[in-house]
């Protein structure tokens, strides 16, 4: 038993850590790292473990709160009434179990007859960003995001720009009214926004929710004002001081209210009608009442049929006990009300014919099989292409050209091929064969051992990788070409002026000045920066080539060991593995890179343009040679890059994690877990002054 309890505790800790990481990505950065279905599965597993082992429940568990802490860029707002999440259901059995619990509780409280079923108010689960609007004496005074449910971000200035949000309520408004609702963007308006963003060469959004969240959380309200945001109210928080009619039907809509609330209506539906009378937008298109589990499931099925025709995205429906006195009796658990349930839709699926499998070359050379499909309507859009991820996935799913396949919009965003439909494979179906050469540049395609991704080896030559290669090469840690950024590289490549790294060195100020957002002074400065990059250190040049697995430190070590680019190009794997800290994986990567004729050709072109790397300087002394440093926190004067350069110049190494092999940890302000780890292992800890003294700077 002790062993099982220990295993449960370990799994609970792992789940909490993973869920919190996903929460930060979803709630704070608006950049979800997993699909809703994957997140829900993790949360359900954690809930079950905590149910089985109640001694493991802690106030910090993700099951006891919602989301993640807000960013520091906005002011914080403490919710007087917590903005709780909802429990989820994924199948009819869970909906029926919810209905039974509600009915049993209300019958026990005398609010339902034995032969009577609960009445519910059913709504769409809008896929946007939850916010709370605070009105005082009818005037909008504050708007906040959900945040972690207890504390959100102050987005008042941005919300005031949303035309659907009234700045002053109509009629006799209460002294205090908190309105909860969803900010979202219609699909048609989302498409127009993305077309406009693309035309201005600005970031396009992944989906309407991402666009709505990103628009609402802009630091500049003027940007928010230009975005087609909508708002629908669906609930409330604090309600105090109703003029002329004081009732106490509902003491607190959730734990934490500052004083007793008074509401004008006794059902959830009637409260939404009241909010609409005050001038707040309420989504009434599909809202309706239903009785018992049978009514709930009928609503769910009807909305599922009508979902593709909706102007906005939804990811489920919401059921709420309609009677407010009944809601009060049912109450809350730590993170969700007992009187409400979200019934989620599965990722939408459809079947179609797989016409072909082609390969797509990514910006880093990754080769991805892409299914070309007979057009099919899935998840509100027409899908003609879908990812197959990698060669192993194609084999595992046994997908063949000519198959009838199931297509799913994973997470309602990214179309993917789930697999073939059993029994519908034609006699002439063909297996996919990974090409041996890149379809873009003709360079060899190789798949390193123990890796799922095949890659084009023509990094410096391949047009598909050109922009990313140039951006990396121009970086501060590589050739350090100041002024050569992403948008300028886009212009140079798209116009055909630059087809390889060597072409940069033939640019002149006259042709640069003709580009968009480039004047004579900027062009002159860029040409000067390119000229300075004709004599980089050998380590910088090697790093600039973008060889897989070769980072800044490895490039410097290899450069010091071999002394010239020619020696590195001609070294075999055994010789390369003889360089400091170069194992077989890195040695193989370097060897494959220079075995590709196109890459060797680029080196020759660089030489022809007058690029002559200088030998890498050796360490200034050998007292720190081979010593490993870890940097954590913020130093008063040096940046991390500056500290790293000084350490490397002294022969030391810089690592990202603390271990028994770490010689020194340099800790600045707000040092985190790395400092604690160093103290635990007895590693020497230095501040900035201590580091400078050690380096003799």
Swiss-Prot record:
It comes from Bordetella petrii (strain ATCC BAA-461 / DSM 12804 / CCUG 43448). Its cofactor is Mg(2+); Mn(2+). GO terms for biological process: DNA repair; DNA replication. DNA ligase that catalyzes the formation of phosphodiester linkages between 5'-phosphoryl and 3'-hydroxyl groups in double-stranded DNA using NAD as a coenzyme and as the energy source for the reaction. It is essential for DNA replication and repair of damaged DNA. Keywords: DNA damage, DNA repair, DNA replication, Ligase, Magnesium, Manganese, Metal-binding, NAD, Zinc. Residues 619-697 form the BRCT domain. SMART domains: BRCT, HhH1, LIGANc. GO terms for cellular component: cytosol. It catalyses: NAD(+) + (deoxyribonucleotide)n-3'-hydroxyl + 5'-phospho-(deoxyribonucleotide)m = (deoxyribonucleotide)n+m + AMP + beta-nicotinamide D-nucleotide. NAD(+) binds at residues 36-40, 85-86, 123, 146, 182, 320, 344. It comes from the Bacteria. CDD domains: BRCT_DNA_ligase_like (cd17748), LIGANc (cd00114). Zn(2+) binds at residues 438, 441, 456, 462. GO terms for molecular function: DNA binding; DNA ligase (NAD+) activity; metal ion binding. Transmembrane segments: none annotated. Its EC number is 6.5.1.2. This is DNA ligase. The active site is at residue 125. InterPro entries: BRCT_dom (IPR001357), BRCT_dom_sf (IPR036420), DisA/LigA_HHH (IPR041663), DNA_ligase (IPR001679), DNA_ligase_AS (IPR018239), DNA_ligase_CS (IPR033136), DNAligase_adenylation (IPR013839), DNAligase_N (IPR013840).
